[in-house]
């Protein structure tokens, strides 16, 4: 099965299934001498971890990460870092009744068609459980970015259904289970989640992620543009159906005179481009938005077929998120951090000696 790795200089390869023995990943390209402990990774894993609030799946996984290699006496050695998380709260019996039925809106049908078989227990490899390892690897990238370059990557929930959340206060993001920066919207979000739980339905969401203090010059035209690699990485997250960089699709209705980011001796006057021009970072904040579909694992009956092609009805039982976008915030941060670290290492290798005299802000 191909497609399990991302990155060139900083490369992450994940393995494992939702109901398998464990999840793991190999992280290549981490420079030596970076202080790193399991606690450095655990913080973000705890933010993504299931069963932490009544608004997410009640599958309870401790997600305790183990560093197997690549770290000695508390610092990275420059060799491959092996990471492992054991699965401890699988309930495979919840899926026995649907092993021969394709859940509508899931990867069951396409996996069966592609491989001729599938792990029906919780979606197997297609499950968002896999993203735990992305978050662990992303935590390494986030620490490197912050420590070596002063780059901070953080995200927030910007919309669930019709409830929009403005970026009013970064501090609020970690103070509520929605990762919402707008305290005035918490009651509306709570009411929406309660209604969905009662109805047995789900809802979509929008997540925003921002990288601050990104150096100028990251990105490799033309096919490895920074925004192209970010879109690739963010679109690879389960349930993501759309990615915007900067103003994204809003540029369709704008004139060039208002959309361009004008430059003065003091710097850029706006950031409609989301910190990327011509596929290369401009030194401004890099801004991306993700649209996540509502999960199809719901109690509302839906039409489908079985492996014999016979019509049947599906009601998904088990433990699922009414809104997968909530736990996607640390995943989006991780994927942006992985891409930025990869491009920083690539920039250092190719253009580390370049010394442009053009002003930077």
UniProtKB/Swiss-Prot annotation:
Q: Which domain of life is it from?
A: Bacteria
What is the enzyme's main class? lyase
Q: What is this protein called?
A: Chorismate synthase
Gene name in the database record = aroC
NCBIfam families linked to this entry: aroC, PRK05382.1
GO MF entries:
chorismate synthase activity; FMN binding
The record's similarity note reads: Belongs to the chorismate synthase family.
Source organism (scientific name): Pectobacterium atrosepticum (strain SCRI 1043 / ATCC BAA-672) (Erwinia carotovora subsp. atroseptica)
Q: Which reaction does it catalyse?
A: 5-O-(1-carboxyvinyl)-3-phosphoshikimate = chorismate + phosphate
Residue positions annotated to bind FMN are 125-127, 238-239, 278, 293-297, 319
What this chain does, per the record? This reaction introduces a second double bond into the aromatic ring system.
Cofactor notes: Reduced FMN (FMNH(2)).
Which key words tag this protein in UniProt? Amino-acid biosynthesis, Aromatic amino acid biosynthesis, FAD, Flavoprotein, FMN, Lyase, NADP
Q: Which Gene3D superfamilies match?
A: Chorismate synthase AroC
Kindly list the cofactors needed.
Answer: FMNH2
Q: What is the lineage of its organism?
A: Bacteria, Pseudomonadati, Pseudomonadota, Gammaproteobacteria, Enterobacterales
Binding residues for NADP(+), per the UniProt record?
48, 54
Q: Which GO terms describe its biological process?
A: amino acid biosynthetic process; aromatic amino acid family biosynthetic process; chorismate biosynthetic process
